[in-house]
Amino acid sequence: MQLARQYKVLLIGDNCTDEWVYGNCDRLSPEAPVPVLVREGIDTAPGMAGNVKQNLESLGITVTFLCNKEESKKTRFIDSKTNQQIVRVDSQPDVKPLHPSQLQMALLHETYDAIIISDYDKGFLPDSKTISDIAGRYPNTKVFVDTKKTKLPTEFSNVIYKINKKEFEALDPGNIPNGENMIVTLGDEGAVWNKKKFPCNDLVRTFDVTGAGDTFLAALVFYFVQLPVMEEAIAFANKAAAIAVQNPGTYTLRMEDVDRILNI
């Protein structure tokens, strides 16, 4: 699949490094009833909004990225023989919030085919004001928002929320977006948009769900900026996420995956 032109996306969100420490784990510690992991190797990849960025860029989208500069890391310790995650250790520093001047500069010199907010609620976007500011200023640009916040602006028709079932259930009852402005992902059951369910028809072996929501979001925007038909974009994103969960760690989509999805 060839892009008809060069598409540009503004991505704003929390960034981290995903890390996997692999090793052999076949005995308990004599000091405490916990497993001993003999380290064999380490893999790292961009996580959270960084994962969205990597997927978009891999598919040929130009991305302007506004994120925290402080290094956040999620380290998972994995038994190589079973691929069982033993424990996850998070390093989460205090994050300086997005400064209005950063956003102003990014919006001043470029026009974007879409804007993405990937908000893991780690402090870079301390409230929902950024959503309102962007959506109100650019009413003709779709703003895709993946957020863990429970109080959301609902008055903007150009905002598309992408949240999972748990996040949907946690929403403030007085701040639930209209059905056409909200996609709720359901894991291996697919997604719901505008009261319509989009099942994931691919029967796949789930190897690792890390970053699957980021893959869904990136694939959704990748498709939508080229062909703004939400039903088709969701179906495409479902298949992209199904590919991601079959791979260990955070998987980066490739154009070969796009061709495979479109040829199914």
Regions found by a protein language model. Give the residues of each.
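Ribokinase/PfkB-type carbohydrate-kinase core domain
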Residues: 1-32, 40-207, 224-239, 247-264
